[in-house]
């Protein structure tokens, strides 16, 4: 299975909602195919401790494991990849240091998309499609903006930002390779059930 096929159901951790390890285990059981560890305020030691546990879980479920922003942590826990924003380490530098990692890059507009492609990213995280409480500084792109980028991008696109069970089908109709979700899964009362339901919706569009 190519890595692109595993981008379809991409879950990002958030300890404000639930413990990373237990929420990821339930999400994987419910069908998540990629996991991203995002721990912006934690110590490096804590990130590595949690990352090692998530690496074990994702391997058991044959899912991809990404670390947000931190190349050192991604390497320490033997992650499959890293996801970076426009202000983080340049994609080209990551490729020099860790050529085997899958690199995702955030893009809020066509210029940022082109920069990510030029620098050698492997996939794009495009959004925010809808307003979101998990990333308050995110710029809203909307469905039209997502469609515009989808039409011209040469890389797989993972849509992100405010995606939930009621709007995910509208997002998938834009021709993306996957959707990234935070609160709709890890913030759910029943994470397993929410993941299963989301997986069923995604499968209608991406086999």
From Swiss-Prot:
Binds 1 Mg(2+) ion per subunit. One of its GO terms (molecular function) is magnesium ion binding. It comes from the Archaea. 2-[(2R,5Z)-2-carboxy-4-methylthiazol-5(2H)-ylidene]ethyl phosphate binds at residues 132-134, 162, 182-183. 4-amino-2-methyl-5-(diphosphooxymethyl)pyrimidine binds at residues 36-40, 68, 106, 135. InterPro entries: Aldolase_TIM, ThiamineP_synth_sf, ThiamineP_synth_TenI, TMP_synthase. GO terms for cellular component: cytoplasm. Its EC number is 2.5.1.3. Keywords: Magnesium, Metal-binding, Thiamine biosynthesis, Transferase. The keyword Metal-binding applies. Pathway: Cofactor biosynthesis; thiamine diphosphate biosynthesis; thiamine phosphate from 4-amino-2-methyl-5-diphosphomethylpyrimidine and 4-methyl-5-(2-phosphoethyl)-thiazole: step 1/1. It catalyses: 2-[(2R,5Z)-2-carboxy-4-methylthiazol-5(2H)-ylidene]ethyl phosphate + 4-amino-2-methyl-5-(diphosphooxymethyl)pyrimidine + 2 H(+) = thiamine phosphate + CO2 + diphosphate; 2-(2-carboxy-4-methylthiazol-5-yl)ethyl phosphate + 4-amino-2-methyl-5-(diphosphooxymethyl)pyrimidine + 2 H(+) = thiamine phosphate + CO2 + diphosphate; 4-methyl-5-(2-phosphooxyethyl)-thiazole + 4-amino-2-methyl-5-(diphosphooxymethyl)pyrimidine + H(+) = thiamine phosphate + diphosphate. Belongs to the thiamine-phosphate synthase family. NCBIfam families: thiE. This is Thiamine-phosphate synthase.
